[in-house]
Curated annotation (Swiss-Prot):
The keyword Glycoprotein does not apply. Expressed by the skin glands. It comes from Pithecopus azureus (Orange-legged monkey tree frog). Belongs to the frog skin active peptide (FSAP) family. Tryptophillin subfamily. This is Tryptophyllin-T2-5. It is found in: Secreted. One of its GO terms (cellular component) is extracellular region. The modification Glycine amide is found at residue 6. The lineage of its organism: Eukaryota, Metazoa, Chordata, Craniata, Vertebrata. Keywords: Amidation, Amphibian defense peptide, Secreted.
């Protein structure tokens, strides 16, 4: 997942 999602 991208860092802003999880």
């Amino acid at each position: 997942l991208p860092p802003w999602i999880g």
